Design a protein with these regions (language model features):
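Class I SAM-dependent transferase core
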Residues: 1-75, 112-113
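Conserved SAM/SAH cofactor-binding pocket of Class I
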Residues: 65-116
Length: 116
């Protein structure tokens, strides 16, 4: 997707990200939808740095998902303060969507970012 001439997502970047942080097919589908929605909104609102669009999968998605490996085993309740464009909270929520009892709370003080 090309957003205001800022560059398209590099397909090789997505492959690199998935090699770094493998996910289930269901999680991948949720992540793809999130990235698609983020890039659509990015056309009207600056949610991520425009220069990071080509590498959104490694720079933002994989970077967010690596937090799952740093958390205590079985951590189910997460909070993302200053969520902005949804990183790292929404990728973590995508990964934990099938985990019973998992909750991810996103907190954002800027109204237009919170509306996203």
């Amino acid at each position: 997707m090309n957003t205001r001439g800022q560059g398209a997502v590099d397909p090789a970047d997505k492959a690199r990200a998935l090699a770094l942080t493998p996910v289930s097919r269901e999680t991948l589908q949720r992540l793809e939808l999130f990235v698609e929605l983020l890039l659509l909104r990015q056309q009207r609102q600056n949610l991520i740095g425009p220069s990071t669009i080509p590498v959104i999968w490694t720079r933002h998605v994989a970077d967010s998902l690596q937090l799952l490996d740093c958390a205590p085993a079985g951590a189910k309740i997460w909070a993302d303060f200053g969520s902005g464009g949804g990183f790292p909270g929404l990728p973590i929520a995508c990964a934990l969507a099938d985990t019973p009892g998992a909750m991810v709370h996103l907190v954002e003080s800027v109204g237009k970012k919170a509306n996203f």
